[in-house]
Structures are given as structure tokens and as C-alpha cells.
């Protein structure tokens, strides 16, 4: 068993830079779909599409808990 004590929920999070805003999604448009570039960790330099809830703009740094999942593209019905 691990005897590690975690003091912060962001201890194992990875920093990512918002490089492009793709659009808004969600029932009321409360989620923004963005492209982010991973700044550290094993996926450093990788570009992902992610959904972010809350205010976001170009150049922001967001903390991602994991870098495996990628958001689906916004499509018109």
C-alpha cells in the first residue's frame, strides 16, 4: 500500500495551455470546446481537444487530471 498523503487535488494534474477556442457546447452553451497543448508530463507537446466549463480565453493555463481522453467535435444536427 502507498503511504503517500495527498494535500492537494491538483498534485497529480498536468498543466495545459489553451491555444485555440473551437466553440461553445452544452444545452445552454455553458461549456467551451478548446484545443490545449500539454506543457509537462509524459504527453508533453501533445495537442488535445477538451471541453472546459467556466470562463476561458486564449493563453490560459488549465490543469488536467488526465490526458488520455479527448472531447468529440461539435457537430451541427
Curated annotation (Swiss-Prot):
Q: Which InterPro entries match?
A: NA-bd_OB-fold, Ribosomal_eS28, Ribosomal_eS28_CS
CDD domains from the UniProt entry: S1_S28E
Question: Listed GO cellular component terms?
Answer: cytosolic small ribosomal subunit
- One Pfam family, please name it: Ribosomal_S28e
Organism superkingdom: Archaea
Output the GO biological process annotations, alphabetical, semicolon-separated. Answer: maturation of SSU-rRNA; ribosomal small subunit assembly; translation
Query: Which UniProt keywords are listed?
Result: Ribonucleoprotein, Ribosomal protein
**What Gene3D superfamilies does the record point to?**
Nucleic acid-binding proteins
Instruction: List, in alphabetical order, the Gene Ontology terms for molecular function in this entry.
Output: structural constituent of ribosome
Name the SUPFAM superfamilies for this protein: Nucleic acid-binding proteins
| Family of this protein | Belongs to the eukaryotic ribosomal protein eS28 family.
NCBIfam families, alphabetized: PRK04007.1 (NF003080)
The protein here is known as: Small ribosomal subunit protein eS28
User: Which gene is the coding source of this polypeptide chain?
Assistant: rps28e
Amino acid at each position: 500500500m502507498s503511504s503517500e498523503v495527498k494535500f492537494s487535488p491538483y498534485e497529480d494534474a498536468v498543466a495545459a495551455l489553451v491555444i485555440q477556442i473551437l466553440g461553445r457546447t452544452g444545452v445552454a452553451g455553458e461549456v467551451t470546446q478548446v484545443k490545449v497543448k500539454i506543457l509537462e508530463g509524459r504527453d508533453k507537446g501533445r495537442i488535445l481537444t477538451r471541453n472546459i466549463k467556466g470562463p476561458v480565453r486564449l493563453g490560459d493555463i488549465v490543469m488536467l487530471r488526465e490526458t488520455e481522453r479527448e472531447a468529440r467535435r461539435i457537430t451541427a444536427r
